[in-house]
């Protein structure tokens, strides 16, 4: 469902799929080939959300930001089931695991894997090609070439 908020209207810039019970509200841009699955909530009421080409936001995930903030997902990003992505940037080809939480101003580099249930604290920077897990998240290794094939 697409909802306007204070004059801000979501934009579908190229055949993005949005499940019937997903909510996309306010200043949200869905790039070509992106998908938003069942129960997901994308709230662009306080800042802009950009969902990159061929990225997917899976069931029950929530994307939001504080006033003046933004959420930017690069191309080919996967946001896992029930993840919370709040006011941050995720680089191309990265995977955000199920139930992971990304807080304000954190940056996840390109081709990263954030483990299921991980908490990426406010302002943390995860370098390109990293695997980060835990609460709080810690980088434990670099993505293997085989894993990188699946994230890019």
Regions of interest found by a model, annotated:
Residues 33-34, 51:
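Short Gly/aromatic-enriched secondary-structure transition segments
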Residues 25-31:
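N-terminal glycine-rich anion-binding loops that anchor highly charged ligand groups
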Residues 1-12, 17, 39, 45-53, ...:
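Glycine-rich hexapeptide-repeat left-handed beta-helix
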Residues 22:
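Compact, Lys/Arg-rich rRNA/RNP-binding cores from ribosome-related proteins
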């Amino acid at each position: 469902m697409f909802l306007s908020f204070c004059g801000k209207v979501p934009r579908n810039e190229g055949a993005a799929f949005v499940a019937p019970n997903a909510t996309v509200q306010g200043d949200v841009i869905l790039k070509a080939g992106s998908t938003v699955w069942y129960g997901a909530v994308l709230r662009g009421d306080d800042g802009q959300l950009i969902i990159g080409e061929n990225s997917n936001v899976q069931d029950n995930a929530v994307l939001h930001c504080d006033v003046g903030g933004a959420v930017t997902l690069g191309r080919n990003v996967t946001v896992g089931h029930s993840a919370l992505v709040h006011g941050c940037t995720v680089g191309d080809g990265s995977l955000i695991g199920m139930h992971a939480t990304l807080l304000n101003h954190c940056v996840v580099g390109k081709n990263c894997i954030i483990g299921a249930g991980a908490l990426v604290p406010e302002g943390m920077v995860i370098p390109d090609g990293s695997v980060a897990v835990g609460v709080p998240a810690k980088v434990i290794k670099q993505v293997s070439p085989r894993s990188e094939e699946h994230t890019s």
